[in-house]
Amino acid sequence: MPKKSSRKLTAAGGATTSAAAKRRLGDRDKKTLGDLTNLADGVVAAAEKKKDPHLDIPTRSLSNVKYNKTKRFIEMGSNTNRRQLFNLSQAKSYMQTLLAASGSKRLIDEGKTTSLRGLFYMLLHDIEGTKEKTFGDQSESDTVIEDLEVTVNALREELHVYASNRGGMVGPITLIDSGDEIDCARMGSGGYSIPSIVEPNVIEFKKCTAKFILHVEKDTVWRRFNEDKFWVKHNCLLTHGGGQPPRGVRRLLNRLHTELKLPVYCLLDNDPWGYYIYSVIKQGSINLAFESQRMAVPDAKYLGLRSIDYERCELADGVKITLSDTDAKRARQIADYPWFKGKKPWEKEIDQMLKNGFKMEVESLISKDISYVTEQYVPARLKEKDWLD
């Protein structure tokens, strides 16, 4: 039986089983390939027993995640949504999921990767005998890939699918990136562009003398720190995620912290979005709750911007951005997260922002001086160990 299902899945993807045999698969590729094949085996087994083939997709929602107080990150619960072949409302999404599995297997077999956009076109075709296409647009295939991730317990990048690079790093670390040696202290004004796939088989850490990591929210703030050579003066790595950090950035932060024992400090906007970004870096995200152990950094610290900084730093009135009703609602939702609830410093922080009635961006510190954030604010927070946990 396994041989039969394996052939079917491979044929659908357009590759041959010998393709994988011609190259040496890493342990993770072997596991992912095995999980994809097992998915196909289950379909064939159900069909041979004359049962309705189905897939049980773990539910990706807040209601299906739990906070592990011991590990200090969120984990996925046991709730699933069943996707059945012989259910008219589910048949197409069932087909799309197996089609995505087939495409991923083909990529692994051939030792190639593709973008989310590339995968969409790779899987796009007319369904024989109908006027239907396999996918209406890329948003459908993106969602299916996320479903496939949680079903086979593998990151998208382990399915050989990547997103566009977003995020950067500079500092005293030398990497081996796909065989090329990269000195991140010699990357000019733009820094090293953090790729989507940063697993050990792609990115190796050759040498690092940094003492910690400062992660800032936006490229604009990162550029100020880089131009002022903050990373040279304080012997650290400086990273950014272009707003909400993408998977590659979060996975890299996790690896740098776990493997090199580097503390992670976050400098984010004083608004609900900044709080949420910190939550995702520290505890993990709902969509990737099944992989929090490889994505989250439970020891990450929140340096700022803080709700008390308007008065503490004597900022100008012009930096205030009025909190909207949506902002206030979101802040209360975040305060109610199990990993924030009960933490007095965080309750005080969020309450203060709500009382203030305004939010602030890190760039607001420029109203003091263009280099105030790099020369005074962050050095003082680090020296005084003044952060939220």
Language model segments and positions:
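Nucleic-acid enzyme cleavage-core boundary/entry regions
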Residues: 1-265, 272-389
